[in-house]
Amino acid sequence: MQFVSWATLLTLLVRDLAEMGSPDAAAAVRKDRLHPRQVKLLETLSEYEIVSPIRVNALGEPFPTNVHFKRTRRSINSATDPWPAFASSSSSSTSSQAHYRLSAFGQQFLFNLTANAGFIAPLFTVTLLGTPGVNQTKFYSEEEAELKHCFYKGYVNTNSEHTAVISLCSGMLGTFRSHDGDYFIEPLQSMDEQEDEEEQNKPHIIYRRSAPQREPSTGRHACDTSEHKNRHSKDKKKTRARKWGERINLAGDVAALNSGLATEAFSAYGNKTDNTREKRTHRRTKRFLSYPRFVEVLVVADNRMVSYHGENLQHYILTLMSIVASIYKDPSIGNLINIVIVNLIVIHNEQDGPSISFNAQTTLKNFCQWQHSKNSPGGIHHDTAVLLTRQDICRAHDKCDTLGLAELGTICDPYRSCSISEDSGLSTAFTIAHELGHVFNMPHDDNNKCKEEGVKSPQHVMAPTLNFYTNPWMWSKCSRKYITEFLDTGYGECLLNEPESRPYPLPVQLPGILYNVNKQCELIFGPGSQVCPYMMQCRRLWCNNVNGVHKGCRTQHTPWADGTECEPGKHCKYGFCVPKEMDVPVTDGSWGSWSPFGTCSRTCGGGIKTAIRECNRPEPKNGGKYCVGRRMKFKSCNTEPCLKQKRDFRDEQCAHFDGKHFNINGLLPNVRWVPKYSGILMKDRCKLFCRVAGNTAYYQLRDRVIDGTPCGQDTNDICVQGLCRQAGCDHVLNSKARRDKCGVCGGDNSSCKTVAGTFNTVHYGYNTVVRIPAGATNIDVRQHSFSGETDDDNYLALSSSKGEFLLNGNFVVTMAKREIRIGNAVVEYSGSETAVERINSTDRIEQELLLQVLSVGKLYNPDVRYSFNIPIEDKPQQFYWNSHGPWQACSKPCQGERKRKLVCTRESDQLTVSDQRCDRLPQPGHITEPCGTDCDLRWHVASRSECSAQCGLGYRTLDIYCAKYSRLDGKTEKVDDGFCSSHPKPSNREKCSGECNTGGWRYSAWTECSKSCDGGTQRRRAICVNTRNDVLDDSKCTHQEKVTIQRCSEFPCPQWKSGDWSECLVTCGKGHKHRQVWCQFGEDRLNDRMCDPETKPTSMQTCQQPECASWQAGPWGQCSVTCGQGYQLRAVKCIIGTYMSVVDDNDCNAATRPTDTQDCELPSCHPPPAAPETRRSTYSAPRTQWRFGSWTPCSATCGKGTRMRYVSCRDENGSVADESACATLPRPVAKEECSVTPCGQWKALDWSSCSVTCGQGRATRQVMCVNYSDHVIDRSECDQDYIPETDQDCSMSPCPQRTPDSGLAQHPFQNEDYRPRSASPSRTHVLGGNQWRTGPWGACSSTCAGGSQRRVVVCQDENGYTANDCVERIKPDEQRACESGPCPQWAYGNWGECTKLCGGGIRTRLVVCQRSNGERFPDLSCEILDKPPDREQCNTHACPHDAAWSTGPWSSCSVSCGRGHKQRNVYCMAKDGSHLESDYCKHLAKPHGHRKCRGGRCPKWKAGAWSQCSVSCGRGVQQRHVGCQIGTHKIARETECNPYTRPESERDCQGPRCPLYTWRAEEWQECTKTCGEGSRYRKVVCVDDNKNEVHGARCDVSKRPVDRESCSLQPCEYVWITGEWSECSVTCGKGYKQRLVSCSEIYTGKENYEYSYQTTINCPGTQPPSVHPCYLRDCPVSATWRVGNWGSCSVSCGVGVMQRSVQCLTNEDQPSHLCHTDLKPEERKTCRNVYNCELPQNCKEVKRLKGASEDGEYFLMIRGKLLKIFCAGMHSDHPKEYVTLVHGDSENFSEVYGHRLHNPTECPYNGSRRDDCQCRKDYTAAGFSSFQKIRIDLTSMQIITTDLQFARTSEGHPVPFATAGDCYSAAKCPQGRFSINLYGTGLSLTESARWISQGNYAVSDIKKSPDGTRVVGKCGGYCGKCTPSSGTGLEVRVL
């Protein structure tokens, strides 16, 4: 406590004053002990006093010393105590009022104060981020202070005109008014800022307020106005106009275009940000109404603000926000806007807040992202966030004149509703208000948008600069217009939710009272700054620096704060010095009268007139509320249709801009604008989008179209004030008139008739179908393809009556969908690329149309079906009342009557028309009949309340309603009470009697359930007992419900279920049909043994189809010729039945039809004699022709194959005729060769060189498989059986042999200068120094038989040089004969078999070169020319022409992964298609029947990294994920991998030694009682080795010392206390009276004893009786036992009990005790669940209880219901549970869509997905995963969406369950999809399941079925996605 230090300071001050001897001596106070801020204050004061306020009560009496106002702390008390600041030791209640007294300046001041929190929200919260720094130690030194209760407002000395505004936290801080002027008071602060808020008599400074003297100004500096529109600017070192700005919205209007902003605003429309509005509890309601708006604001102050303002920060910020709130209360804004601060976040450490730098744009972006993270649904919600910083923010590196920054129109966007403001003193409030204006979509007052509103000079809140002419308290007309339109258009829905009601009123105090004019200068220009004297007061605040008043007065053009004193008795208000108003009344606004309706917006076609009213009778003043209610109303005008030749109204508005190019690149000066309809978002339909004629580029030329403009081409709705409003075809606002099928607005379909027909005649070219007359409506034409394919060579066409084609003319067909405008009508065409080609239009056609069909190609018959409505001719029509209309509803639910409705009918076609047609005709009587005859209506008593008196007479209420009693089943159904109005309703109140007993029912165990399933009952007995378990009469327990019977086993029994019968397996004759039969329990299939086999339905039964038809062939007819070659015919008929009835040939199998023609040959003919002329026969044969079908697919996928088609002879009627009738015509080919793509061919490159240079070696070559373009392909694409050889033998010349002596090669020397270096020649002949020298013998010239050898012989001298004079006769031989053995000869074997039986085959034999001993030699060793042939032709005779090999299609690969093979059938076939033996085709090369193939990649186990050890010390486990995977990304089921090679997923690990934890017990506390047995406690904690306290779970629980023990002191004394007897419990018969009997402890010092419930054994003696019998008179009433229904079983499994109520009641349903107890029915019985308690509840229990180790489906008991769950990983210790999805992966999938629009600002095709979109498919995060099973956590009942073990990713990356997204468009056009279908699983999603959108422009559209089993969603953005909320997860429940 700091009282001593304050007392010392006060003593020193008093001593200093005494030494000075006068009041003026106060200036000589020891100021070195005061805070510097107060030192400066005292220096400016002419007089002041030091006082100590005293808190008093309302009578002026001092409070006790322990009562003092203090600043409250956030604690649990604040939740229950509305004013915790007042502490009292007594039991007096706290109050919101406070009274203080002080003496100063010779006067007594008595303060009467009332709490006043102003603008602070009831749940206002202050959040501190980080630890205060060294220089911030005084900022919330202990815990955050609650300032809401600090603010008080009241009056002085009982005079309400003498206002006081005081903050009572840490002393009295504020101002008050007296008869002699205004006073200020504040507590003294010491040098170190210490003060004691608990101290009562704290010294305060009190001083008068006087106007400062000022000197004239020397002049003003010029203001610099920047054109930059993006930021606010501020002063630097010289006077400068301050700039405010905004971030420009990308879609401007025409005014912005004309000002040159088109480049930025129209670079590409659609880049406009499409804000995602936060969905709040309020839905969009009616527009153009003024609603109260509540702007919940988060204010964030950075660490620089903390450093600058210190402990005063919160006060300062609340003062700023009070000014902002008052600005938004000004009536000039035209709306009721309430600014409410809900949260203040103070950032001590820079790292804990958003990144703040000098760059304003970056800071805003960082702050917006940061604040969104603080706006969680479960936390403190805010609508917008404001950042206050002392950081000098800049719009560029060298342009730091920015004061604030915000984006336009983002108030309800949770990601972008934020702004930043640089703190510059109290004028910061105007910056905050300005930036919030941008958030409300207000432009600057000098913006081109505002010129239309007549704002010529920016002088209001949204002025771009704050200068001398600015009025920052009021709003311009432009600002009012834009915020009103913004809110009326529905962009402020999040502001409709009102914060919780405030506990007290919130008036606003003026900031100038809290901050004097010098303090305002310091806040702007720093410490030491003071107001410049002699300047104009209030209008602008001029401040000087510390160097003197004449050296640098400067201003930021901000006015003095409201409430700043300017002259005696006056203060500043809105920049003017005005008299102080003592008690300004608050005036709420009220609506004025409606203005007359204005001019019509259109001259025809439905315009709008508008009337408005202003909030001006009166206007809101002095903080009053703005009007609430409708401000505009509309009515239709000029609704008559426009002339047909008049241009479209939207077209006229676009044409207004013809010739205006707005400086957009690429637009010509004569540009022409036309309306843009398609591709515009629904919410933008009332903006004027125009397209450049002849181009696709479009732009927004106006913010809104003219009122009355249709919203689109396909609707009657019209635009009003930029919103699409409902209108009818009569062009009247809010009309529901629609055109009937005849095109008549509001018609009854009676003015037209329907014309319908078909057309199927074919002729080449254009064929006329029908003429559609002018005036036709509802045209629908469809052309069905004959084969269901899109390509059938028939196309619809339209032409005008003049023959001009409108669609598909001149043999040019439109394949894509298109629209055709014919006058004012729009005709839609589906395009020719559809199986059903369609032309349709609902509009009235004003000209005649000719419908045609274009037939080309193969001239298939068209199938055209058309219908349209045409006006009825003007002849009179007859109408009559038809009494046989539909039955109307029954007049009553029971015993009522219903009648047929009379309908007006047209006689000509019996069409029902409007009743107006029959108005003047007499109506016949109604046809009636009784209805609801199977039930009755009566009043039903549903229930009775308990008796109002527990003892004696009372009453109870009855729940009575009108009920429908069914006579059939006796059920009761509640209906409206009005149906029972014919019967008097019984009273809902009846008398009753309380039994005055304290008894209760004691039950026996429930009996076993009477049925094991399908609902049985259980019973139990009930006995009435008292608290001592004494048995009482049952009448003593009638106040409690007796439950002795209950229902049990209410789940259904397993039942046989059967599917639909299949079709009969035969089409004729007798066959069978099948159906599935299974055992089902709920939604689950069980094993058949679970159902009764005796009742199993049959699964197969016989079926009888019509008798089968067969072919019957007649005898052959005569040969067609009398000689030579001819043919014979016979009749072939299709017959059926015993009587052999002839039926159509289509009823017989065409494949088995016998031939009806054959060749015949008679003797050859002799040449006929020449005849002069032959006469032509006049017989005309029937006209026949060959018809053929389409070719089948080629039998081979590559290379040569075959294809076939159906060929049939048809007569002129198209019926099948005998082929003989077409014999004279060439028969079309029915089978031919085909080739889809060439197969791969083997390509062999050149042989390599031989591997040796002599002798035998090997040569190799490369063999590749290439396609038709010679590109290398996989070898499996080529025939493996015909692969060329890749290596072969090769022979080189024989290798030389080495001699044993020299090792030199035996060949003659070729070089005459050769000189041996070593050995001497073998033979030497010497002559005169010259000698012959010989070389070695060469090889034998022949390898066999006789040959010769040669050697070199040379003449050399003694030196070895060549000489010429050697003796010739002794010259050695140069050649000699040699013998190498016998030569090899050609040997050959026998010829092999011929490769073909005919047509020229090949046969081969073995031919080798060898010696007689069998030694083989290369072929070159024998004479090649003599080599016998090793192959020759054979069987060269011609083969039959009608046999060939035929191949079937290749089978699928034999393996699903890895290498395998596939095969096909190869068979020999005759020309007529019949099969032959293979020998007939042996002469042909047989195609291969086998080939290699390769499946996908085989799944393999993939093990992840080991996790960290499960413990930080000791022995633990490590785990890793082991999954079955295909490739690197695709996840497979674990069953697809080999379970025996699965890597381990868990292993042991060893951590460091664990620390030792022990229990530590502290000292015992005092005993809880002063007498008798009590208890005492002590604290027992767990500590570590260092004696530090840790969590108790770390110590051994078994060794924990006791923390409680009994303590026994002196015995207590007790006494019996009895009460008065009650009245008798009954009015007749035997009853009893009661009284209270209590054992009470004797307390010392108390005169009276209290009733208590001490145990009775403590009291001495016998307990006095508490019940006494009584008898008043006999009861004449008889009674019977009545039983209720059995309750539910007490256990979910095993044996339990169930109960029912048994009551003794009189005939009047009154409780009685006259029933015979021996006849009482049982009230309690045992029950047994059909399933025993050993049913497993998870897969781990399945493994433990059943010993199962196989993965599969098992029944688990989940939340009381048996469900089928798939258990996976049963071989491991931790199996997992999965839910098998009954509807499979077709309805359970997740997708991240991969396409991205080239122009992401569009949403083409109205959001539909099209593969032909203008897209690129490059989104890297795309993927598609489908799910067969999903994992479930049975503990939390949550779906684990990221488990993909049973998911199949067919495209891209895996996508978690229930997740979707895309990167498709930024225009709310989601394409990513997910689907959940839990039907049949027994589970459904809970209501808490939520999805959140993430990413940029993220949007989601999620639809849930009512039962939660089905969810479908579309999500996306640019780029965005939706995932289940992490807060709620994907929780499921058991159905």
From Swiss-Prot:
Encoded by which gene?
ADAMTS9
Q: Which positions are annotated as binding Zn(2+)?
A: C223, H434, H438, H444
Check the UniProt entry and state the signal peptide residues, or none: 1-18
Zinc listed as a keyword? yes
- SUPFAM superfamilies assigned to the protein according to its UniProt record, in alphabetical order: Metalloproteases ('zincins'), catalytic domain (SSF55486), TSP-1 type 1 repeat (SSF82895)
- Kindly state one GO CC term assigned in the UniProt record: intracellular membrane-bounded organelle
List keywords of the entry alphabetically.
Answer: Cleavage on pair of basic residues, Disulfide bond, Endoplasmic reticulum, ER-Golgi transport, Extracellular matrix, Glycoprotein, Hydrolase, Metal-binding, Metalloprotease, Protease, Protein transport, Repeat, Secreted, Signal, Transport, Zinc, Zymogen
List where the motif Cysteine switch lies. 221-228
Q: Which residues are glycosylated?
A: N112, N135, N271, N749, N840, N1213, N1267, N1788, N1806
* Any Pfam family matching the protein: ADAMTS_spacer1
Its cofactor is: Zn(2+)
This chain's source organism reads Homo sapiens
- Residue ranges of domain Disintegrin in the record: 509-587
Domain (GON): residue spans on this chain: 1735-1935
Enumerate the subcellular locations listed in this protein's record, separating them with semicolons: Secreted, Extracellular space, Extracellular matrix; Endoplasmic reticulum
Disordered: annotated span: 192-242, 1289-1330
The Gene Ontology biological process terms listed for this entry are:
aorta morphogenesis; camera-type eye morphogenesis; cornea development in camera-type eye; endothelial cell-matrix adhesion; extracellular matrix organization; heart valve morphogenesis; lens development in camera-type eye; melanocyte differentiation
Which tissues is this protein detected in according to the database? Answer: Highly expressed in all fetal tissues. Expressed in a number of adult tissues with highest expression in heart, placenta and skeletal muscle.
Alphabetized InterPro entries for the sequence: ADAMTS/ADAMTS-like, ADAMTS_ADAMTS-like, ADAMTS_CR_2, ADAMTS_CR_3, ADAMTS_spacer1, MetalloPept_cat_dom_sf, Pept_M12B_GON-ADAMTSs, Peptidase_M12B
Where in the numbering of this chain does the TSP type-1 domain appear? 588-643, 878-936, 939-997, 998-1049, 1052-1109, 1110-1166, 1182-1240, 1241-1296, 1328-1379, 1382-1440, 1441-1494, 1497-1555, 1556-1611, 1612-1676, 1677-1734
Q: What is this protein called?
A: A disintegrin and metalloproteinase with thrombospondin motifs 9
> Which residues are responsible for catalysis?
E435
Primary site of residence: secreted
